[in-house]
Amino acid sequence: MTKTAVITGGTGGMGMATARILGTDHRIVLADLNQERIDAAVVDLRASGIDASGTVCDITDRASVDKLLAFAEAGDHHIRAVVHTAGVSPQMGSAQFVARINAIGTVNVTEAFLARATEGDALVNVASVAGHGLPKILVPSGAFPKAESDPVAFEKIIVRRSRVFGKKLHSGLAYSFSKAFVIWYSRKQAAAFGARGARIVSVSPGSFDTAMGKLEADHGASDLLKVSALKRFGKPEEIAAVLAFCASEAPGYLTGTDILVDGGTRAGQEFKKS
């Protein structure tokens, strides 16, 4: 039975960099929204000697996620790891759109993989530095459980809370809330994964040199670099190394936690105040 790693958002900079690392000892299945981009990414990986394939998946549709995992399992393949990098940033849509993709999409991927997970399997959810450091009074954490039971109500609460500041900040706040949710939800699901002998973690990137990272940098996110310890954008390979390690069998005791990979941004913010 061949070990398989599924990577959502697989054609992006983070996804491809992770595929190159995991592809040394895993069969790779890429998932994204555009088949042409998937096909091009698969050709690229195969040229490097990686056993790769891919299929379209809409993570906001649970049936589409189930179809993705069935595709990955076809032919007696076992999904050893899922690295869930798919998501959107504030500049890519409305507050509701951001909440749906980042939060509800994560629920769908997590629940679908949990139903299949066995001893030694791992799920790595990508959160964000934006999910850290928000005032607790601002984060609608009481609504987080609704993402599982009533996603429509969850989205409405996120959108409503994102309106506490000016319109320009609506999507940004929704993004921060959605990523705080990913961190919370990945911790919440640790026991369920553990009951199957499997692991779940979240990883929170800071500012990275990817298409999405550049988009946000052009709209003010680059200001965070001024307070960071390293004073530069992270390289896709640097975050991929962490994602691939978490997805591998090496950190067998690592679960139910978040790993912050932000070049010292949060540390800089904290100690700048002191």
What is each PLM-predicted segment?
Residues 194, 199, 254-256:
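Short, small/polar-rich loop/turn modules that mediate ligand/substrate recognition or access, typified
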Residues 255-274:
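Short C-terminal tail/terminal secondary-structure segment
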Residues 132, 204-215:
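Short, flexible catalytic-loop segment of classical short-chain dehydrogenase/reductase
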